[in-house]
C-alpha cells in the first residue's frame, strides 16, 4: 500500500479511485492531479514507480486535504457561530442549516425524541 498525505492508498484499484480515499480529494480533483502528473486514470497504483508516486504526493500537497481541510471547515463553522448570523445560530442549536423543514423530519440533526415530562 502506498502512503499519500498520511493515508494508506489501496494498490489494486485504479489511480483515480485510490486517490479519493484521501479526505478532500474527489474524482474531479483526482483526475486533475493525475493529468498534471501525466498518469492515465486507469493506471493501478502498484504499477507506478517511486518517482511517479512522489510527483503525485507533490500535487496532492497543493490541495487542502485531511487535517488542514477539517480544521478549515470547523473554523468556518465557528466563525459563523461567533458572528451570530442565522446559519451560526442553526449550527449552535444543532438544527438544519439550509432551510429544511423541522416540524417533521430532521431527526438525524435533532437527535432522538425527548419525551414530554408530565
Curated annotation (Swiss-Prot):
HAMAP family in alphabetical order: Ribosomal_uS13
Coiled coil regions in record: none
Listed Pfam families: Ribosomal_S13
Lineage: Bacteria, Pseudomonadati, Pseudomonadota, Gammaproteobacteria, Moraxellales
The species this protein was found in: Acinetobacter baylyi (strain ATCC 33305 / BD413 / ADP1)
Entry keywords, A to Z: Ribonucleoprotein, Ribosomal protein, RNA-binding, rRNA-binding, tRNA-binding
Gene: rpsM
Quaternary structure, from the entry: Part of the 30S ribosomal subunit. Forms a loose heterodimer with protein S19. Forms two bridges to the 50S subunit in the 70S ribosome.
InterPro entries noted in UniProt: Rbsml_uS13_C (IPR027437), Ribosomal_uS13 (IPR001892), Ribosomal_uS13-like_H2TH (IPR010979), Ribosomal_uS13_bac-type (IPR019980), Ribosomal_uS13_CS (IPR018269)
Protein name: Small ribosomal subunit protein uS13
Amino acid at each position: 500500500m502506498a502512503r499519500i498525505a498520511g493515508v494508506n492508498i489501496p494498490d489494486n484499484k485504479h489511480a483515480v479511485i485510490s486517490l479519493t480515499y484521501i479526505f478532500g480529494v474527489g474524482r474531479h480533483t483526482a483526475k486533475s492531479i493525475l493529468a498534471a502528473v501525466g498518469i492515465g486514470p486507469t493506471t493501478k497504483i502498484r504499477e507506478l514507480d517511486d518517482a511517479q508516486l512522489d510527483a503525485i504526493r507533490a500535487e496532492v500537497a497543493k490541495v487542502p486535504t485531511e487535517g488542514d481541510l477539517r480544521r478549515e471547515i470547523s473554523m468556518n463553522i465557528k466563525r459563523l457561530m461567533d458572528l451570530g448570523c442565522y446559519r451560526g445560530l442553526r449550527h449552535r442549536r444543532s438544527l438544519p442549516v439550509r432551510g429544511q423543514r423541522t416540524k417533521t423530519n430532521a431527526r438525524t440533526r435533532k437527535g432522538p425524541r425527548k419525551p414530554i415530562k408530565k
